UniProtKB/Swiss-Prot annotation:
Taxonomic lineage from the root: Eukaryota, Metazoa, Chordata, Craniata, Vertebrata
Entries under PROSITE patterns matching the protein: HMG_BOX_2 (PS50118), WD_REPEATS_1 (PS00678), WD_REPEATS_2 (PS50082), WD_REPEATS_REGION (PS50294)
Protein name per its UniProtKB record: WD repeat and HMG-box DNA-binding protein 1
A GO term, aspect molecular function: chromatin binding
Residues of the DNA-binding region: 1013-1076
Organism the protein comes from: Xenopus laevis (African clawed frog)
Binding partners and assembly: Homodimer.
Compositionally skewed regions (Low complexity) per UniProt: 948-960
GO CC terms, sorted: cytoplasm; nuclear replication fork; nucleoplasm
Subcellular location: Nucleus, Nucleoplasm; Cytoplasm
Residue spans of biased composition, Basic and acidic residues class: 846-857
WD repeats: 11-50, 52-91, 92-131, 134-173, 184-223, 228-267, 271-310
Acidic residues composition bias: residue spans: 819-829, 858-877
Record gene name: wdhd1
Length: 1127
């Protein structure tokens, strides 16, 4: 029964037109000279979807939802199907590509072009290319062996070549075609094809016939021809089962043969006699789509059905009838359900089974089915509906062409291993390119030219003061290169004649020999190289890293855990990435080692896994200009080593976010931390740039992938942590003895604290007080004071109280850390002085005694200044249950730490001892004046209750007290927190009673202070003068808040202004004349008199006070004020 020919329809303008079915067979896809790909749901579809791919489309292929096209822009492009979205440019030619095909599983493509080249490349990684050279004229067509071992190509030079893909060698050259100088002048485009699945034959159109060549012997074993063909055959196409071959000729004839019988089954003539330029079999049905050179599209149905419907002459029983029904059936939807089995009866001779055996490789045992007891129950073997029947012999799938019959048995092979990434050099373009970048880094650019005219290497420096440009003849065929400010390093692969070589051009050498070369051992191939500061390194196929000095001295050898992928260096650092195992499901399994090769050699990263994006590979590896390791994967994610978080990797930029199109990429050439930028080259429709014209470098900003980056909170968080990460390199540089920009570090810290304060204010507005406390953890002491002030002004007193407690803890930690630092420094200095000029023999002086020595020395130097503070602390410890002291390291450490802490918080000018006084200033008044400096911030954090009515029983306990920084106060009932959470004691009853009498109301107490002419601090004088302005701006503040506001304003004064107020306070004693001074008792005498001690023993009383510790100094001062008032 002849095939049914549908009426042809217009598809594209006049010119070469290509056609194929998609994998499911639901769509017809065509391309033509108008540069469009059209997707047809059927031949009658009046509104096909169009995808524009260029000016003209010469060829295309469709597989696994991807369309690869050869357009007039000389590029092989990839698009998604059926969306038609661009998915990248796989490769480029210098002229038009004439034919492009997929392999069987869709992982590779092959393309032949007019520049005589055939390229084979991976779809997922276009950098893995193989170039087949040998044709001397434009390539007409290419075809993959279904086993992916061979590739066949036809050319205008009159030859058909069979290539072995793995080693890019030509296995055979078949001079079968007529020669011509261009594709347009060729009598036939010679679309050859391999037999599906087995690949046993390759069909080649030769004149008016089709030659079949054997795969193994590459000899012509059969020639298919027919008198119906009067012009040269243009194209051949195999049925998916491999049993039928169809050919289209230049004069519009379509002929189909049965390969087993060599019989011609179909003869169809084009209605207008136009040239047939494309043929495609339906994957499931007996249909063939074809196009002509006028852009028309046609369809043939029921192709070769006459061959399968002849009854078998061998079998006549009922069982055989059922058997034939099982495999033949009348299910027309699955064309080869009956086709592949029934074709044997087409020829009634005894060689049927032999022919079938020759094609399948295994005879079918029909007796096994006939002898089965239940074989007569044939309907039980049929599947429900129109599904495919179960075929007992699984080898029949090699004969049955369509996937519906191939296997009913389901199986899972487990995760598929990912091919390992090949070694590469960072900043280089693929090796197969004739003009390529061997390296592009922060020092210079190395280009390689490898064509018929020249094979050379050019070295160009960004800064010509380093060295002038260098031109080298690439006689050794170097493929790897690196450049630094000291040398140029080159390496070549091993060949049959020469060993792999490492060549170094040491242009910074002071002698006349500026070049050296070393050969690798036999069989060892260099795969990666890099240049460090004073050393070079190369990684070889023997899983070794060889270290040389820059002058050529062999140094360390390092064994790798797996094959190297890439290597980079910066100064003394060397980073190596290698395969630590087999990856699965498209993922690479890479490990990384980071070594420091300076004087103190150490390994920082010990083969840790290298994190990559899903289904990606490493595309760039190196260091920032400041020396931090970083890398980029194929998805455009840039990651940096975060040394402050246990040497972890953090993503800092996504270059794909800046690409305009899906096929665009950025080719990274360098990264800087100050300023924060990625230097890269934009590549439109490709992954790497061409060498000419010279590409322009673009700059991309860093952007950490934080959540809610569009909100104000997310932006500030991202800015804070980005600044934190990129200011860490200064610590690393200073630790290793490099110069670092202190201004940069200060500016970064300033910006971080500003961001923290902004986030703190935002959280306060949102009533997120717990979040405010979390943000305060990162604040410095000064910024935390601002936060306390902001919280107080925002009427968030609980938050301010908690911030005060946190400030105490942080100050305590800071003081403790500084004290330990001083102890370590003094310990080192003490021992170095003892052993200066002598041997290092161990003695008792070498024991760890730094802590008591430090404490004794500190107490000896500061005994007089700290005397009054010690008495108050001891009194508090005796009269009250001790509070947890964060400074408590030993018996006397709290006193030392308390005094140091006061110094830290009272001044921003370094660690100055505010208690340092001369011997003539040891009066109680001055001692109390000194103690005031530690109590000002203490009183800032207190929020006293409002005084109750006069005469109430609670007046003595909760009465509003004037905040006097000169003396410590007793705790109120609720024990509110202070900024300085130091140990406070409950005073004895006598002291409390006298205090009540001495300070009944704030105005009177102030008058007493003025009357007694007690010395004031500079801050008190300033506060007295500026108190009205503070109250006018902030009405309703109580005394504690006034002092806090005053303290913040006083700190804003310059150091000179503060010093003036201090000097003014020291000179504010005159107010009494000499006579009054003689008449009036001295404060020490008043203290002794009020305590019942004789006046003449004042000095001895002071000495006795040291021993017996009667009362604190603050109590004595208040008692003296009380005694004077009573007079």
């Amino acid at each position: 029964m002849p095939a049914i020919k549908k009426n042809m329809r217009y598809g594209h303008p006049e010119g070469h037109t290509d056609v194929c079915f998609d994998d499911s067979g639901n769509f017809l896809v065509t391309c033509g000279s108008d540069g469009d790909i059209r997707i047809w749901e059927s031949l009658d579809d009046d509104d096909p979807k169009s995808i524009s791919i260029g000016e003209k489309a010469y060829s295309f292929a469709l597989k696994n939802g991807k369309v690869v096209t050869a357009a007039s822009n000389n590029a092989i492009q990839l698009h998604t199907f059926p969306d038609g979205e661009p998915d990248g440019i796989l490769t480029r030619f210098t002229t038009n590509a004439n034919h492009v095909v997929f392999n069987t599983d869709g992982t590779r493509i092959a393309a032949g072009s007019g520049d005589f080249l055939v390229k084979v490349l991976q779809v997922e990684d276009s950098t893995q290319q193989k170039t087949l050279r040998g044709h001397s004229a434009p390539v007409l067509s290419v075809s993959f062996d279904p086993k992916d071992i061979y590739l066949a190509s036809a050319s205008c030079d009159g030859s058909v070549r069979i290539w072995k893909i793995s080693d890019q060698t030509c296995e055979a050259v078949l001079p079968l075609l007529e020669k011509c100088n261009d594709v347009f002048n060729a009598k036939s485009i010679c679309r050859l094809a391999w037999q599906p699945k087995s690949g046993k034959f390759v069909a080649i159109p030769v004149g008016k016939a089709v030659h079949l060549y054997d795969r193994d012997s590459l000899k012509n074993i059969c020639t298919l021809s027919d008198d119906f063909i009067t012009q040269p055959v243009n194209i051949v196409a195999w049925s998916p089962c491999g049993q039928y071959l169809v050919a289209g000729s230049v004069d519009g004839c379509i002929v189909a043969w049965n390969i087993a019988t060599k019989a011609c089954l179909e003869r169809i003539k084009h209605e207008k006699g136009y040239t047939i330029c494309a043929l495609a079999w339906h994957p499931h049905l007996p249909q063939i789509a074809y196009t002509d050179n006028e852009g028309n599209l046609g369809l043939l149905e029921d192709v070769c059905q006459g061959d399968v419907k002849q009854p078998s002459a061998k079998v006549s029983s009922a069982e055989t009838k059922d058997y034939d029904e099982l495999f033949d059936g009348d299910d027309d939807e699955d064309f080869l359900n009956g086709d592949m089995i029934g074709h044997e009866g087409a020829v009634n001779d005894e060689d049927d089974d032999d022919n079938f055996t020759a094609l399948t490789g295994r005879p079918r045992n029909r007796g096994a089915i006939f002898d089965d007891d239940i074989s007569s129950d044939v309907p039980s073997l049929k599947l429900v509906g129109n599904e495919n029947p179960v075929v007992e012999d699984d080898q029949a799938s090699s004969v049955q062409n369509f996937t519906s019959v191939a296997s009913v048995k389901l199986s899972y092979n487990g995760p598929m291993p990912t091919p390992q990434q090949k070694p590469f050099q960072s900043g280089s373009t693929p090796v197969h390119l004739m003009h390529r970048f061997m390296v592009w880094n922060s020092v210079g650019v190395i280009r390689c030219y490898n064509d018929e005219q020249d094979n050379a290497i050019d070295v160009e420096f960004h800064d010509t003061s380093i060295h002038h440009a260098i031109h080298l003849t690439n006689s050794l065929n170097h493929t790897l290169a690196d450049v630094s400010q000291e040398a140029v390093l080159l390496a070549c692969e091993t060949t049959e004649e020469l060993a792999s070589k490492l060549q170094c051009l040491h242009f910074s050498s002071w002698d006349t020999s500026k070049e050296w070369m070393v050969d690798m051992p036999k069989g060892e191939n260099i795969q990666a190289i890099c240049l460090g500061q004073g050393w070079v390194a190369c990684a070889t196929s023997a899983l070794l890293i060889r270290i040389f000095s820059v002058g050529g001295v062999q140094k360390e050898l390092i064994s790798l855990f797996g094959p190297v992928v890439c290597m980079a260096s910066h100064g003394e650092q060397l980073i190596v990435v290698y395969h630590r195992g087999m990856g699965f499901d498209g993922d690479q399994c890479l490990g990384v080692q980071l070594l420091e090769l300076g004087k103190k050699k150490k390994q920082v990263l010990h083969g840790d896994p290298l994190p990559l994006s899903r289904k990606s590979y490493l595309s760039w590896l190196g260091f920032t200009a400041e020396g931090s390791p970083c890398y980029v994967d194929s998805e455009g994610i840039v990651r940096l080593l975060n040394r402050s978080l246990g040497d972890t990797w953090v993503p800092i930029c996504n270059t794909r976010e800046h690409c305009k199109g899906k096929s665009d990429h950025y080719w990274v050439v360098g990264i800087h931390e100050n300023p924060q930028q990625v230097r890269c080259i934009p590549c439109k429709g490709s992954r790497f740039p061409p060498t000419l014209p010279r590409p322009a470098v673009a700059v991309l900003p860093f952007n950490l992938p934080y959540c809610q980056i569009t909100t104000e909170k997310g932006q500030m968080e991202e800015q804070y942590w980005r600044s934190q990460i990129f200011s860490n390199h200064s610590d690393y540089l200073s630790k290793h003895g490099y110069e670092c920009d202190e201004n940069f570090k200060a500016e970064a810290q300033k910006m971080q604290q500003e961001l923290l304060m902004k986030m703190f204010a935002l959280s306060c507005k949102l009533e997120r007080e717990f979040r405010c406390m979390e943000l305060a953890e990162f604040m410095t002491q000064n910024v935390m004071n601002l936060a306390i002030k902001y919280a107080s002004r925002s009427k968030r007193l609980i938050l301010a109280q908690r911030l005060s407690e946190m400030a105490l803890e942080k100050a305590a930690e800071q003081a403790s850390a500084e004290q330990n630092e001083e102890e370590d420094e003094e310990e080192e200095d003490f021992r170095s002085r003892l052993t200066a000029g002598y041997s290092r023999t161990a003695t008792e002086w070498g024991d760890s005694r730094a802590k008591p020595v430090k404490q004794d020395q500190y107490e000896e130097n500061n005994e007089e200044e700290m005397e009054e503070e010690e008495k108050e602390q001891e009194e508090a410890l005796e009269s009250n249950t001790p509070t947890a002291n964060p400074f408590n390291k030993s018996v006397k450490t709290p006193d030392v730490s308390e005094s140091k802490l006061g110094a830290i918080l009272s001044s921003n000018q370094g660690r100055v001892n505010p208690f340092k006084v001369s011997a003539s200033q040891k009066s109680p008044a001055f001692a109390s004046n000194s103690s005031r400096s530690t109590s000002i911030l203490d009183n800032m954090g207190k929020f006293p209750r409002k005084p109750s009515a006069s005469g109430s029983p609670s007046t003595s306990k909760s009465d509003s007290v004037i905040i006097k920084p000169l003396a410590p106060k007793a705790k109120s009932k609720q024990g509110q927190a202070t900024l300085f959470h130091s140990v406070q004691a409950k005073p004895i009853a006598k002291k409390t009673t006298e205090e009540k009498k001495a300070v009944p109301t704030p105005p009177k107490a102030a008058a007493d202070i003025a009357e007694n002419k007690k010395p004031k601090t500079g801050f008190q004088l300033w506060l007295d003068e500026n108190r009205p302005s503070i109250l006018s701006e902030n009405a309703g503040l109580d005394e504690s808040e006034i002092i806090k506001e005053g303290m913040s304003r006083f700190r804003m004064l310059t150091s000179e202004e503060r010093m003036l107020w201090t000097e003014k306070a020291k000179g504010d004693y005159p107010g009494e004349d000499g006579a009054d001074a003689k008449k009036r008792k001295r404060p020490e005498q008043e203290n002794m008199a009020s305590n019942g001690c004789p006046q003449e023993n004042t000095d001895s009383g002071i000495a006795a006070a040291k021993k017996h510790k009667p009362l604190g100094q603050s109590a004595n001062n208040k008692l003296s004020a009380f005694a004077f008032k009573k007079e």
